[in-house]
Curated annotation (Swiss-Prot):
NCBIfam families: Dxr (TIGR00243). NADPH binds at T10, G11, S12, I13, Q38, N100, E102, G178. 1-deoxy-D-xylulose 5-phosphate binds at K101, S126, E127, S151, H172, S185, N190, K191, E194. Disulfide bonds: none annotated. The lineage of its organism: Bacteria, Bacillati, Actinomycetota, Actinomycetes, Micrococcales. This is 1-deoxy-D-xylulose 5-phosphate reductoisomerase. Its cofactor is Mg(2+); Mn(2+). It catalyses: 2-C-methyl-D-erythritol 4-phosphate + NADP(+) = 1-deoxy-D-xylulose 5-phosphate + NADPH + H(+). One of its GO terms (molecular function) is NADPH binding. It comes from Tropheryma whipplei (strain TW08/27). The gene is dxr. Pathway: Isoprenoid biosynthesis; isopentenyl diphosphate biosynthesis via DXP pathway; isopentenyl diphosphate from 1-deoxy-D-xylulose 5-phosphate: step 1/6. Signal peptide: none annotated.
Amino acid sequence: MQRVIIVGSTGSIGTQAIDFILKNRDSFLVVGLAASTQTSLLREQAQVFGTKNTAQGASEAAELIEATEADVVLNAITGAAGLLSTYATLKTGKRLALANKESLIMGGKYFLDMTSFKGQITPVDSEHSAIAQAMKSGKFSEVNKLILTASGGPFYDRESLEGITLKDALDHPTWNMGPMISINSATMFNKGLEIIEAHLLFGIPYSQIDVVIHPQSIVHSMVEYKDGSVIAQASVADMTLPIGYALSWPNRALNAVRPLEWGARQRWDFLPPTENSMRSINLARRAGEAGGVYPAVLNASNECAVEAFMAGKISFARIIHVTETVFNLYTKQHTNRESAKNPIEVILEEDARTRELAKTVIENMSAD
């Protein structure tokens, strides 16, 4: 039986994980829960599993992880707030089921160096879960490229991004997700972050990581091998499967999702990204290749831009413009440099510095 801590238990991934565990109670024991919002739901979840180990907020979540004996931690917190939970999980030698890609992107090589055993970080993102499964079909040296699939979001065929409302941006065509990742999917920024995540998790150079649009969201990603073979992982669009795979690793999950209906006629399209989406993807590649604190800076820039859009301060069309502007200003003013400080302190300091810069940029744009 695996002892599980879920941080971000009241969010989209957290609640889906709880539903999965309730169907597989013989395999999992929830020993801790943490959330930043919906405290009444958090209390209800704790009662269901009979645990008194609960926490509110990012700092308390990290303390809970350090103080509680567990086999696996599901980090389902949204955004940079998940950094401390990832740090605490790796520091205490627990296995990390990672839905919070932002923390890995921020921590980068530092977090990879903290891992104490193979498979300590198991991805929850459907794309990276698919890659992890497909890479079992060959040796690392035999991999030619990784191909990340993207639904294209709700605006793939739209020429102009002007006039898009918050409701429009949250209406994802295939996935049920939280607001931040839904908007990041709509701008394709999420796919840019996933390129950085794939590079860190699998050690494949950026030049060998491609993106294709697959509107049906059935093929979740692919690995192309040097002999010309392509190994893909396909399933219905349901996050329960990658959640279950990450929690059950190295075994496959039971009672996850229904199989595809192979007797029914299906259409699988694969299309190139649009010029609009490549702006996000290329910006992420640039930050990832630069390394150091730059991926953390990029993430903070985007989080501030998305929050400004959600607050009605900027238009949807300006999200990536703000992200790019803040990132460019930061890189002009600061360079990656060695520091005697704890890397987590450095990351948090530069994250805060970026957010102050973003605040000024957004205020100036709002005044125009």
